[in-house]
Amino acid sequence: MRISQLEGKTVALWGWGREGRAAYRALRTRLPTQALTVFCNAEEAREIDALEDAALQVETAASAQALGRFEIVVKSPGISPYRAEALVAAAQGTCFIGGTALWFAEHAQADGSVPGVICVTGTKGKSTTTALLAHLLRAAGHRTALVGNIGQPLLEVLAPQPPPAYWAIELSSYQTGDVGRSGARPELALVLNLFPEHLDWHGDEARYVRDKLSLVTEGRPRIALLNAADPLLAGLQLPDSQVRWFNHSAGWHLRGDVVYRGEQAIFDTADVPLPGEHNRRNLCAVLAAVEALGLDAAALAPAAASFRPLPNRLQLLGSVDGISYVNDSISTTPHASLAALACFAQRRVALLVGGHDRGLDWHDFAQQMARQAPLEIVTMGANGPRIHALLAPLAEAGHFGLHAANDLEHAMGLARAALGQQGGVVLLSPGAPSFGAYSDYVARGRHFAQLAGFDPAAISAIDGLGVH
């Protein structure tokens, strides 16, 4: 559905975060007199009133009855379509779409293809991978957009001039389904990995996997690039796409610190500022994508050495009194915390875990702690007591020290005391979202930096967002 098709219909926007505001501006630019209603909270309603838009109404109660009055509801990604009020309204005929679907419909050609569009998704690593892809495409001399879930809504860059040669688009599981619903077919879709996440939004693990994979199953990209090492991806049948693989011995893969293409050693990653084996494996994914686009990936590989790591992702803030502080606030799953820990296997580490409870299973994390644990673990947040109870038997058996904190400030004090004069690493890798305590993971990372004695401004914006 293109924006022009909304003209004359009853249309509402649900959500007034950055995505909601981007949708409003895009619709207002194309449809300046279209009547719109925004469902938002009371504080946001006051902000909207200040716009003095006579064709814009505000409602603060998004009930099934209220939503059902509209033919079209443009929904922000964070609002689940599986909520009861959305399901009831949809059953009564309301069409729910996202800004991602509108953007893809606007850019699709007559046959549905969207040349130059590369979509990246996965449970972890997708932001760094998308940014690294844009970095290499720009290194090859191509004007490239770095947009999407990474920090710039697609509708903020609806029609940049001159248009980019490539679009590197990060998509969350909240957005992947929009691609197929738009009828558009990306040139390439890259799926890095799949672990359970966002179960509160999706409802259960099976639906999460289905929604995530809809990028390739329903989006039908020209090229589907998949991780051969992920069992949930290895068995996929995608008859409408050319399927390519990374992390496979016949293609781009990692051996130690060296990237190989088949049996040919291509590039030593020792000088690449990508902490962790998982990030170096994702470099293989980027090189496979570049090659699939017809570029010389081997020649571009050394450009990865000039990539600037993203903030809040295994970000070393510095050291104070023998203790290094690492900000991995982006970590929202237990698997992400395990990947972060693996980067510091030989160090004295105090790990801070816990946050908003989405019901994720921490048993795999606990099993790994029985085999190779940090020196200390500090639990915090809404799911902190649940994690603490799961880890307590291992701590009592002497695998690690275990502490319970009321909040991040308390956790920092416990971590410092536990490391003592010998020093080590305080690693914030919560394995859980920040909701409830912070507005987002960036705010959590900034607070961590402040508590560690660093300027919160060190949690800088992501380099290269937008079209360059």
Curated annotation (Swiss-Prot):
Gene Ontology process terms (BP): cell division; cell wall organization; peptidoglycan biosynthetic process; regulation of cell shape
Key words of the record: ATP-binding, Cell cycle, Cell division, Cell shape, Cell wall biogenesis/degradation, Cytoplasm, Ligase, Nucleotide-binding, Peptidoglycan synthesis
InterPro entries per UniProt: Folylpolyglutamate_synth_CS, Mur-like_cat_sf, Mur_ligase_C_dom_sf, Mur_ligase_cen, MurD, MurD2
Name under which the protein is recorded: UDP-N-acetylmuramoyl-L-alanine--L-glutamate ligase
Disulphide bridges, residue numbers: none
Major subcellular location class: cytoplasm
Family affiliation: Belongs to the MurCDEF family. MurD2 subfamily.
Highest taxon in the source lineage: Bacteria
One Gene Ontology term of the molecular function aspect: UDP-N-acetylmuramoylalanine-D-glutamate ligase activity
Catalysed reactions, semicolon-separated: UDP-N-acetyl-alpha-D-muramoyl-L-alanine + L-glutamate + ATP = UDP-N-acetyl-alpha-D-muramoyl-L-alanyl-L-glutamate + ADP + phosphate + H(+)
Gene responsible for this protein: murD2
Pathway it works in: Cell wall biogenesis; peptidoglycan biosynthesis
SUPFAM superfamilies linked to this entry: MurD-like peptide ligases, catalytic domain (SSF53623), MurD-like peptide ligases, peptide-binding domain (SSF53244)
Functional description taken from the UniProt entry: Cell wall formation. Catalyzes the addition of L-glutamate to the nucleotide precursor UDP-N-acetylmuramoyl-L-alanine.
Localisation per UniProt entry: Cytoplasm
Highest classification ranks of the organism: Bacteria, Pseudomonadati, Pseudomonadota, Gammaproteobacteria, Lysobacterales
Pfam families attached to this UniProt entry: Mur_ligase_M (PF08245)
E.C. number: 6.3.2.53
Spans traversing the lipid bilayer: none
Binding site for ATP: G122, T123, K124, G125, K126, S127, T128
GO cellular component: cytoplasm
